[in-house]
Amino acid sequence: MPNNESTQTTVDEILNVDEDNDEDESNIFEKPWLLEIDNVPDANRIVGRDDHITFLAKNLRKMRTNSVPDNVLEWGETGTGKTLVARHVCERLEAATEGTDSPIVTAYINPDPISTYTSTFRKIAEQVNAKAENPLEVPYQGLSAEHYRDQKLWPVVQREFSGGLVVIIDEIDKHGEVNEVLYTLSRTQSKDDVDFPVITIGISNDIEFKGEIESRVQSTLQPEHRTFTPYEEDQLIAILENRRDAFYDGVLDDEVIPTTAELAAEEHGDARRAVRLFRNAGEIADEEGDDIVTAEHVHEADELVEVELFMEMVKGTPLSGKLLLFALTRLDRNNPEKEWFRTSEIHEVYQTVARDVKVEPKGYNRALELLNKHVTTGVLESKKKEGGDQGKFRSYSLQGDVESTRTGLINSTPELQTLMGW
């Protein structure tokens, strides 16, 4: 039987911080916040995106001159600077108009597969009120989307941010009701009778999602499309050099930045991955008590990053969706010669996994729907086979490494931890 008192003592020792003990201070990181994924750096740390920054700044400046800015849709693979550019320019816009007669407010929404039309407007209202001097209370539930807008959002913008509202919606392809959201935002001035501009910046990693935006939305939104290309290896090096001061002087081996950039460049020039690798390598060195961060630490970090990225991709996924992915990893492990598995095969193993963790399995059609959502988010690939003796059927394949996917699922899903050895 485990000794709970001993376990509690160990936890307390880990959590305790002795301000007079130098051992509690990192010998590696001086400014760790520079490596946080959500950190929006100063302009002099941003690399290779001057044209996009200039375009967006000039476009949004129209809000200050009674002109009508364009709505914007940004396209490009993960880690190409889309979110960074949008958030950087919007932060500067808020700062530039603060204290003027027409301040402008911005909201940033990062949806997941379970985001709804109503929850999106609640989140926008929450963020706007959080920045207001005299905020309104925004209840978490119980109101319609129209009520959130008409009673909790537009009155506050009108009263305190008469220059207008800019809404950034990240990863629009993950939002199940994004067409309705974009349509409503694009018709705000005509339909909701407000006299301030409401501008939308939509961001997507999936260029093919353009075809999923309904024609009525395209017609009212009339967006300016901006395409972000992957970073080159030398640009990734510059991005990391601009964050070198996150570390103490002298702790980075000369090979760390080139190795990190090279690994990130292999993954379509992903700056987000590069910064995460950079940070994780430092954390590994710190945890191991090393005084120098080396290329070996970077390679160790590379394995961990795969798991972290996967956990981000499935964040917000319902339990059944995760169990289906776990079933697919089990099929992959047991059939190393196969890459593609039919829906019926996955569903059969999924039913076993669900019962193993004491969850009632979903039916075939719901499983198919969940698998297709994973295709939308890039976790899975799918293909359809028609004709032949077996008729029509759909097959699925994991996009990422099987073991990283499996580890990420176990780490993010308590119900699966009992199956760790399976």
UniProtKB/Swiss-Prot annotation:
It comes from Haloarcula marismortui (strain ATCC 43049 / DSM 3752 / JCM 8966 / VKM B-1809). The gene is cdc6m. Involved in regulation of DNA replication. HAMAP family: ORC1_type_DNA_replic_protein (MF_01407). This is ORC1-type DNA replication protein 13. Signal peptide: none annotated. One of its GO terms (biological process) is DNA replication. InterPro entries: AAA+_ATPase, AAA_22, Cdc6_C, Cdc6_lid, ORC1/CDC6, Orc1/Cdc6_arc, P-loop_NTPase, WH-like_DNA-bd_sf. Belongs to the CDC6/cdc18 family. Keywords: ATP-binding, DNA replication, Nucleotide-binding, Plasmid.
